[in-house]
Amino acid sequence: TYDEGTEVTVTATPDDGYEFIEWDGNDNQSNSFTISVNSNITIQANFQIIQSNQNYYSSGDIIPIEPVVFYDRELTINGIKLLAAGSIGGQEAVPDSWVYKTAQVFKLLMESDAEGIDSDAQINMIKTLKGEIGWHQGYPAGQRIARGGGNEYSPNFLDDNRNQSYPGLEAFEDALALDDMVWYKNIDSQGTGDDDINEIIEHTLHTIHRFGVRGGVEGSTEALNIEAEEEDITNTDIFLAMKEAYTNGVFDIEGYGGDINNRDAWPVMLKEYQYLLTFGMWEFSEFWEGGSLSPEWNDNARTPSGIQANNPLGYELYNTYFKPVISIPSKEILREIFKDDDQGESGY
């Protein structure tokens, strides 16, 4: 209780980890101000959690999805929602151990203290993956994980009738930005640890490249646009680099129909090109069977020097947009995680 006309100083003092944002009942923008009391008034301070950049690096745990919509578990890692198929469609559930291994790979690809990482650009990449900013804002990136291949499920959860076969699946997936699958025990795999590494790195890169790297470095949203169905991409940096690789005999497109002018095939070509370019710049060809993926990717482009000589636009593209935001995972650590016959520990 104060006498009329009394001057009172009001101060909002936040707890650790919080910051003052505004007052209810007063328009003053400062966290401390003085007023003259002439009538009964109510003033309330509002606070919010301070969002530090480190908060964007998250290593969540597996939690159940209820009700089950083909996927029965999820885990969020650095803004990416991993979705694991349950025991459904005649298949056993993807084991938790493989979900953790997938999460650890994403973690290894986004090390904040790795050499050459631009911290601001990497944070922008994670914000883009979360759907907080960027070209798919409102739709967080997801990574689907299932067993073997689509035809290993009866009915196939990837075909046009999937919503009839698995009610609610389409609406569930439509709320996310999704690209490729990560397969546990891929039907094409020989069961070796190196096969697993190649499988999982390829498909996690597809997700990060499309939904995160495009959004990390300034200018990347335009430069790395592969959405050919939505707009003209013929003058983007990514398309020009891919076309140069094709023209120079580095990137063979027979597996994608063989027609460089087929716009419908461009998104897949560009997705695969980014993965192949990255493997070459990392010198990861040893994970390919026999150390080669020729003719799809020429043996002369399995090293940075080879790419610089034979696909200079790709070399520049990688160093400008990929290198500042994606960390190169250790081959030794990957081989500890992925050993032959499904052995190895995630370390997550």
Named regions from a protein language model:
Residues E4, F33-I50:
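Conserved "repeat-terminator" motif of extracellular CCP/Sushi domains
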Residues T6-F33:
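Surface-exposed interfaces of beta-sheet-rich extracellular modules
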Residues N46-S59, D342-Y348:
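Low-complexity, Pro/Thr/Ser/Gly/Ala-rich linker/spacer regions in secreted
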Residues I50-N78:
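N-terminal low-complexity, Pro/Thr/Ser-rich intrinsically disordered segments
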Residues E66-P67, I77-T247:
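Acidic/His-rich structured neighborhood in mature extracellular/periplasmic domains
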Residues V213-G290, P295-N298:
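Post-HExxH zinc-binding segment in Zn-dependent metallohydrolases
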Residues E272-Y348:
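Pan-zinc metallopeptidase signature
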